[in-house]
Curated annotation (Swiss-Prot):
Species assigned in the record: Chlamydia trachomatis serovar D (strain ATCC VR-885 / DSM 19411 / UW-3/Cx)
Gene3D superfamilies referenced in this protein's UniProt entry, alphabetically: ApbE-like domains (3.10.520.10)
Positions bound to FAD: 33, 71, 112-114, 170, 176, 253
Protein family according to the UniProt entry: Belongs to the ApbE family.
PROSITE patterns, A to Z: PROKAR_LIPOPROTEIN (PS51257)
Record gene name: apbE
Its job: Flavin transferase that catalyzes the transfer of the FMN moiety of FAD and its covalent binding to the hydroxyl group of a threonine residue in a target flavoprotein such as NqrB and NqrC, two subunits of the NQR complex.
Lipid modification (S-diacylglycerol cysteine), residues: 20
Cofactor: Mg(2+)
Name this polypeptide is given: FAD:protein FMN transferase
Lipidation residue positions, type N-palmitoyl cysteine: 20
Catalytic activity reported: L-threonyl-[protein] + FAD = FMN-L-threonyl-[protein] + AMP + H(+)
Enzyme Commission number: 2.7.1.180
Keywords: Cell inner membrane, Cell membrane, FAD, Flavoprotein, Lipoprotein, Magnesium, Membrane, Metal-binding, Palmitate, Signal, Transferase
Length: 316
């Protein structure tokens, strides 16, 4: 089983109010691809429905692992990344549809969400973990082998063509949110009130068993957020850092420069975005972490009519 690179995740937690007499509900919990998940149905499922629900959840996770997981060498996306040919590559319907969504995310984000930075990110991580910096020649080579414009999708043939042999796709910036969307669809077969969380990305439907909305906590705001038929995704810069030559680098690449954001000049700590689509919220939270200031990020979010919460180093 593969695992996901957990750099953009892990800052949301379910906020369940306790009472002396807990309402009836059904909870499924486990760990998939090294990341814990929690699913709460707003009613008690029958034993048969419980077993069927678990099978559906497992089916979704297997699908994500086999198709979209960059850390699974046997996944469809990993096979595509190993290909250096610049000829059309047939895609499964699921992966093609997801890449079409990503095409929209990239355009909406003004290029700040760019999943083609995979090879460039791998280059930097390899060097940063050794406390070194890639040479200017390598940076130039990999930077010019990155960019969504180097991916060509043929909607008629449902194929992908690389316009550079080095370009690779890193889906980690949105695939957890996408998985949560699929898990929500699976849960809807059994109950119209549910809460789905996987590694910090959350999707809700209907109401909590107590009759209130679902409540969650986020590191991007001190508020308790109440969700109804919406999802929330969070990205942050505080989880991975490396010290090289008196500088501290984060794991987040600036899509404009192709270099990791420096901790000293990057005040944003965490971003949460609320949307009906968890995949979209995940992508936009990732994009918002690349801005140089909280105010600049908030201005852009307002311009795009995004519901975003942002915390920075200046928080009291």
């Amino acid at each position: 089983m593969g695992k996901f690179f957990a750099s953009y995740l892990l800052i949301l937690a379910p906020f369940f109010l306790q009472s002396c007499s807990a309402p009836s509900r059904t909870t499924l919990e486990g760990v998939r691809m090294t990341i814990p998940y929690r699913i709460v149905f707003g009613e008690a499922l029958s034993p048969d429905a419980f077993q069927q629900a678990q099978k559906e959840i497992d089916r979704v996770f297997d699908h994500i692992d086999q198709t979209f997981n960059n850390w699974n060498p046997l996944s469809e996306i990993s096979r595509i990344n190993r290909t250096t040919k610049q000829t059309p590559i047939p895609l499964s319907p699921a992966l093609f549809a997801f890449l079409c969504e990503i095409d929209h995310f990239h355009a909406f984000s003004d290029g700040r969400f760019d999943p083609t930075l995979g090879a460039l990110k791998s280059l930097w991580l390899l060097h940063l973990k050794s406390h070194t910096i890639p040479s200017q020649e390598l940076q130039h080579l990999y930077k010019h082998s990155s960019g969504w414009h180097l991916i060509s999708l043929d909607k008629t043939q449902q194929t992908l063509r690389k316009l550079s042999p080095l370009v690779q796709l890193d889906l980690c910036g949105t695939v957890k949110g996408f998985a949560v969307d699929l898990l929500g669809t699976a849960c809807a077969q059994f109950c119209q009130n549910y809460y789905v969380e996987w590694g910090g990305e959350i999707k809700t439907k209907g109401k909590h068993p107590s009759g209130r909305s679902w409540a969650v906590a986020s590191s991007a705001t001190p508020e308790i957020l109440h969700l109804h038929d919406h999802a929330i995704a969070t990205s942050g810069s505080q989880y991975q850092r490396w010290h090289v030559d008196n500088k501290t680098y984060t794991h987040i690449l600036d899509p404009l420069t192709g270099t990791p954001l420096e901790d000293s000049s990057h005040p944003i700590l965490a971003v949460s975005v609320i949307n009906e689509s968890c995949a979209f919220a995940d992508a936009m939270a990732t994009a918002l972490t690349t801005f140089s200031s909280k105010q600049e990020a908030l201005d852009w979010a307002n311009k795009k009519h995004l519901c975003a919460y942002i915390t920075d180093k200046n928080v009291s």
